[in-house]
Amino acid sequence: IIVMDKNVIKQIILNQQDFIGRIKLQSRNVCFEENANYVLVGIRRAGKSYMLYQHIQHLVANGHSIEEMLFINFEDERISDIRKEDLYLILEAYRELFAFQPIIFLDEIQNVEGWEHFARRLADEKYRVFITGSNAHMLSREISSTLGGRYLTKEIRPFSFSEYLEYHNIHLPQHWELSPIRADVVRLFSDYFYYGGLSEVFDIQDKKSWLQSLYQKILYSDIVMRKGVRNERSLRLLIRKLADSVMQPTAIKRLQDILQGDGTKITRDTIGSYLDYLHESYLTFGISSFTDSISQRESVKKRYFYDNGILNLFLFLPETKLLENLVAIKLYNKYGDDLYYYNKNVEVDFCVPNDGLLIQASYRMIDEATRNR
């Protein structure tokens, strides 16, 4: 049994305090209640860590000292083997450095099995705690039950286009489309359209390589390793087929037929599990037909990607699919499970029955059938 070295934890605490005190951040709108604890979840690189950095700088600007901040990134290779039995050492290490009651930030803790018991104890002992993770399983009933209502949750999504413009210091005046700023907006929208809203990609030259690396990290670390996927080839092929099928309702049986046609033996249950894994890791989400029965809604869905940049890795001549995917992202972020598509007698890309909304997404209006819809 390897026992974690407290001196390593101390070094990490001090390193993070120094780093967060110096880093310059682009502000993003997020509000935390003053005395609440939080779990932040979302796709990797959506900006969860930077939201914590921003909040720490806000706390320091409003009277706290940086020494009160206990920030641990669990993807730091120096503590990659930490176990739940070692988590108490984090507080011990901090107390040997400082006499404050710390405000605790636990970044990407989901890979420490049983982390929720430590989080529950911290809340019970009246610490203020902020936790981030890249897996929707952190919102599951089992974990929520262990946390016992002591944490509020926020899902952090990639930047919207309005946030993307703010990041680039673009503020739209009235009638902006007739002003010189229009050229900047068009240029930035093109980047956002093809490369998505994950903030770390914004200032990178080789965006496609960065997105490919991120995709491989999510696939391998958050799905293959975490879930024990034995047939990685079939999972990769499924993701490609989902990208090809964006805009189209797809049944699990149909996916099975497609995969088996490519020589992959796979059961419907396995495909169902893979789809759950993709949703939990914030790669894809699905919407159901408003006219389907409850059972059909689970088995037949239109599936989209949480970020256009990752979807675009798989596409050739991508514009039509990227546009509908971008509309789906915007609507899903706003309406969640109240968003459907409609396909009885007439096809409608998106509908929100509670608000009486019917929305059609079309990149070009040349096709007469598209205009008629």
What residue ranges belong to the model's regions?
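Interdomain motor-coupling "hinge/lid" segment immediately C-terminal to the ATP-binding subdomain
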Residues: 5-17, 136, 142-249
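Pre-Walker A adenine-sensing motif
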Residues: 16-35
